[in-house]
């Protein structure tokens, strides 16, 4: 049975959520400009969009923008802790918008929400035209659903939750098993209708590129994460704002003078390290990439291995997009009152499950998303958001102005997919947004900051080989 009614924590929070949305409108000039430019033409009319992205106030304004462009929406969060319940309540009152999201979902509830957001119409195998994804969970569910349905059809083999490596995988496989027993063609039928997905984050893009390389993509994917106006703004400036916000709300510890270890010096790591340095911390970086490592050194940071610094650090932050970055052996060596958190998308950068199941430890919940673990040696360490995104679990994520950049890119990606649904422009591969749209997103935000652009004259344009209106850089240019 298809769930056609929103499921949120408390609908009475909607008025407060709407007020927060109104306040944030002024901080999201890009989205507001898109509404002005495109709203009248309803370019997304009749489009069915499933979103799996953090259900925050800023996300509510993205949903409202897509709705104002004519789309029908079904939405869930991409993290069990990241929903702002007042935002979910507010946006669920909009026409043609159905929301399945609340803070502190269980893993079973989380995957139920993802499945519900992907299931449209009277039949349970009627899905969306397009997906807005963050981390790739909605895309993963469709692809794994098709894979297991094929296995069931050919070999009568069902997903086996007993073979799961962890609790989340068990929930995921249980959902797919039940789904196949109920309708063995559900995900195959849903996948056939999907035009494409626009992916928000590094981890999700990594998943997509793996599938692309193995020719396993079932539909087009647009890589929003690597748009310059996403990667260099959301990833850097967003994390520079929301990491200290999350740490301070969670711990109330002074950061100045402390040793902060940032694992990873990509764009997210750069933003994190910058914020910690600005607060007076002594910042150490761990890196696998010599280019990123030398960038860190040139910015004045110490680059070390985790083994060198693990017993000295006061704060440990992972932001690599990899797995098992901080292992159980590292956690057991940390000094008393060390704080451990993650700002990468998934919870497997830190071996939290291994720690919480380790014999001889004692777990105390200090407050929501803050656990104090007594180790066998008597030291106590503090784990934030159980290894999930601490900036969304312990705070409210990136500020609206930064998210306006990212969500403009998401909107343009959805428009591009929908407008080209009957053309042969895209194959089942991963694509970047074109440069002129990147520049357009930046232009939308300059006025808000009272910035003025210099205009090239005809001679300068001819010399550079560019148009007055851009694009001004080649695709190979590294900002």
Curated annotation (Swiss-Prot):
It catalyses: S-adenosyl-L-homocysteine + H2O = L-homocysteine + adenosine. Substrate binds at residues 56, 134, 200, 230, 234. GO terms for molecular function: adenosylhomocysteinase activity. Changing residue 59 to T: Decreases sensitivity towards inhibitors. Binds 1 NAD(+) per subunit. GO terms for cellular component: cytosol. GO terms for biological process: one-carbon metabolic process; S-adenosylmethionine cycle. Its EC number is 3.13.2.1. Keywords: Hydrolase, NAD, One-carbon metabolism. It is an enzyme of class 3 (hydrolase). Pfam families: AdoHcyase (PF05221), AdoHcyase_NAD (PF00670). NAD(+) binds at residues 201-203, 235, 264-269, 287, 322, 343-345, 391. Pathway: Amino-acid biosynthesis; L-homocysteine biosynthesis; L-homocysteine from S-adenosyl-L-homocysteine: step 1/1. It comes from the Eukaryota. Homotetramer. Adenosylhomocysteine is a competitive inhibitor of S-adenosyl-L-methionine-dependent methyl transferase reactions; therefore adenosylhomocysteinase may play a key role in the control of methylations via regulation of the intracellular concentration of adenosylhomocysteine. Belongs to the adenosylhomocysteinase family. This is Adenosylhomocysteinase. It comes from Plasmodium falciparum (isolate 3D7).
């Amino acid at each position: 049975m298809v769930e056609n009614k929103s499921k949120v924590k408390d609908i009475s929070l909607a008025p407060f959520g709407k007020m927060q949305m109104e306040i944030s409108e002024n901080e999201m000039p890009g989205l507001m400009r898109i509404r002005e430019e495109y709203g009248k033409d309803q370019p997304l009319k009749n489009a069915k969009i499933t979103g799996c992205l953090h259900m925050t106030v800023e996300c509510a304004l993205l949903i409202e923008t897509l709705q104002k462009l004519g789309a029908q929406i079904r939405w869930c969060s991409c993290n069990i802790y990241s929903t702002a319940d007042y935002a979910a309540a507010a946006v669920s009152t909009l026409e043609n918008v159905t929301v399945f999201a609340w803070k502190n979902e269980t893993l079973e509830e989380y995957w139920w929400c993802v499945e519900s957001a992907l299931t449209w119409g009277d039949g349970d195998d009627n899905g969306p035209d397009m997906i807005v994804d963050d981390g790739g969970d909605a895309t993963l569910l469709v692809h794994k659903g098709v894979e297991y349905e094929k296995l069931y059809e050919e070999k009568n083999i069902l997903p086996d939750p007993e073979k799961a490596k962890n609790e989340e995988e068990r929930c995921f496989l249980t959902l797919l098993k039940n789904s196949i027993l109920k309708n063995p063609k559900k995900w195959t039928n849903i996948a056939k209708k999907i035009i494409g997905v626009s992916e928000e984050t590094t981890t999700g893009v990594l998943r997509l590129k793996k599938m692309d390389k193995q020719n396993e993509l079932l539909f087009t994917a647009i890589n929003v994460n690597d748009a310059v106006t996403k990667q260099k703004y959301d990833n850097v400036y967003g994390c520079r704002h929301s990491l200290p916000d999350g740490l301070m709300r969670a711990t109330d510890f002074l950061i100045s003078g402390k040793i902060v270890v940032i694992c990873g010096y990509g764009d997210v790591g750069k933003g994190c390290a910058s914020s910690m340095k600005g607060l007076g911390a002594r910042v150490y970086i761990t890196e696998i990439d010599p280019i990123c490592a030398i960038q860190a050194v040139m910015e004045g940071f110490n680059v070390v291995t985790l083994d060198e610094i693990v017993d000295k650090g006061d704060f440990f932050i992972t932001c690599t997009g990899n797995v098992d970055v901080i292992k159980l052996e590292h956690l057991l060596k940390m000094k008393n009152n060390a704080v451990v958190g993650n700002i990468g998308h998934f919870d497997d950068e830190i071996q939290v499950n291994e720690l919480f199941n380790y014999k001889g430890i004692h777990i105390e919940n200090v407050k929501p998303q803050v656990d104090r673990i007594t180790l066998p040696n008597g030291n106590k360490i503090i784990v934030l958001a159980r290894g999930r995104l601490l900036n969304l679990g312990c705070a409210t994520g990136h500020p609206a102005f930064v998210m306006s950049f990212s969500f403009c890119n998401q909107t343009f990606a959805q428009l591009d997919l929908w407008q080209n649904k009957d053309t042969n422009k895209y194959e089942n591969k991963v694509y970047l947004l074109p440069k002129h749209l990147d520049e357009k997103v930046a232009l939308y935000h300059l006025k808000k900051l009272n910035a003025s652009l210099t205009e090239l004259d005809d001679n300068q344009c001819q010399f550079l080989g560019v148009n007055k209106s851009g694009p001004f850089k080649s695709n190979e240019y590294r900002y």
